[in-house]
Amino acid sequence: MPKTDVSGLSMLGNQTETAANPEVAVLEKVPAGYAGTDYVVRFTAPEFTSLCPMTGQPDFAHIVIDYVPNEWLVESKSLKLFLHSFRNHGAFHEDCSIYIAKRLVELLEPKWLRIGAYWYPRGGIPIDVFWQTGKPPEGVWLPDQGVQPYRGRG
């Protein structure tokens, strides 16, 4: 089993403050092992929060990120703190969702990445945002994201 080089990380194993907003939040990466093997990495954030840019009221989402690494993996503590940096940040659902995905693509240059952002209703209407970089590599096992459409109590 390959040993992961963590020497360049600044957050893992250290006390770390949450960034004031996503633009200044630091995402870190570590080398991916198993070169030549395509596999899917999934992160699920079932309690993601941000603020409505118009009212300042909290917005909530269940976010699922899947990617096939190339040379890098996102370091999970930095991802957790990056997602937390949206907590007091005002932006529309679509902007939050796509920004998260684009930052990860910029950092990792993965073979493939997708995001499913399942937002809880605002004004009685749930907004779901889906984006991916293209077709996934052939032969990877890609499970369903497992988030049911919003039904309310009906």
From Swiss-Prot:
The active site is at residues 52, 59. Its main location: cytoplasm. Catalyzes the NADPH-dependent reduction of 7-cyano-7-deazaguanine (preQ0) to 7-aminomethyl-7-deazaguanine (preQ1). The gene is queF. Belongs to the GTP cyclohydrolase I family. QueF type 1 subfamily. It catalyses: 7-aminomethyl-7-carbaguanine + 2 NADP(+) = 7-cyano-7-deazaguanine + 2 NADPH + 3 H(+). It is found in: Cytoplasm. Substrate binds at residues 74-76, 93-94. It comes from the Bacteria. InterPro entries: GTP-CH-I_C/QueF (IPR043133), NADPH_dep_7-cyano-7-deazaG_red (IPR050084), QueF (IPR029500), QueF_type1 (IPR016856). Pfam families: QueF. Keywords: Cytoplasm, NADP, Oxidoreductase, Queuosine biosynthesis. This is NADPH-dependent 7-cyano-7-deazaguanine reductase. Pathway: tRNA modification; tRNA-queuosine biosynthesis. GO terms for biological process: queuosine biosynthetic process; tRNA modification. One of its GO terms (cellular component) is cytoplasm. It is an enzyme of class 1 (oxidoreductase).
